[in-house]
Amino acid sequence: MSAALILEGVTKRYGGFTAVDDLSFTAGRGQILGFLGPNGAGKTSTIRMILGLMEPTAGRIEVLGVDDARKVRNRIGFLPEERGLYRRMTPVDAIAFLAGLKGLSRPEARKRARIMLEAQGLGAAADRQMRNLSKGMAQKVQLISAIVHEPELVILDEPFSGLDPVNQQALEGVIRGLAARGATVVFSTHVMQHAERLCDHVVLLARGKKVFDGTVTQARAVAPRSLVLEGTLDEAAVKALPGVASSHAEQAEDHMRITAALASGSNGQEALKAAFAQGLDITRFEMREPSLHEAFIVLTGEAA
């Protein structure tokens, strides 16, 4: 089976500015792909080109086996970063209207809308006007509008923005459910924890260029592991241990907690052995694996 999404050498220039520079990646069927990068990295321009909303300056894009997403628009679901629904419509009417544009009959669209609203805890709000819903509720309605027609490819641009932790967790469940039924999900986010929990694969952009393309585990491997020490400690002594590249100290109520980032190639054993040999007062220690957020900073030079 062919990939759901293929980009080969895609470039987008606006006058003399290159927003996307020779970008290539693939999203497989049923895969959850995190499309990550700081502001201005080129994510939105890429999404617009994938959807056929603008043409690339160079390169090739294949969506669900065709060269133009507009030919298969009824098989694609899209949640834009800038939300917008008709404020005087009810959730049922808004969802049914957008579903009709994707080829669903009105009765089927309204039936699905009510079922999905109920599943998201919005059954009681189904017939209230959108302007009377909270921001979180309205975002749920817009998400339902993007997936009510059961698309094969779902593109979500910053879907977690503005959601409280409970609704963020609920959205994670929706994304997993989409992938479980075979849909490909591509989502952009600045919240690395979501990508870390959800993604089979991540593509990371910085200044229009791809700087990483692989699994979350592979991404984390580019950042250093850390040795965390607690006790009556001196940061300078810890920083001087073999294999330690840098350190950060935090004063707790009755002890010092020092996180020592290890140099490339160091497993921390040498530093730990030296610490005990020097008689450092260590009451607790742990080896900590890097997070995706830390890998993001290493790869892009910027915070998420």
Regions from the language model: what does each represent?
Residues A125, K135, H190, E230-T232, ...:
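Structured loop/turn residues at secondary-structure junctions
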Residues A58, K71, D93, E108, ...:
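An acidic, carboxylate-rich microenvironment
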Residues R60, Q129, S226, D281-R284:
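Residues at or immediately flanking beta-strands
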Residues A3-L7, K12-A206, V211-F212:
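ABC transporter nucleotide-binding domains
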Residues A263-A304:
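C-terminal coupling/interaction segments
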Residues E172-L262:
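ABC transporter nucleotide-binding domain
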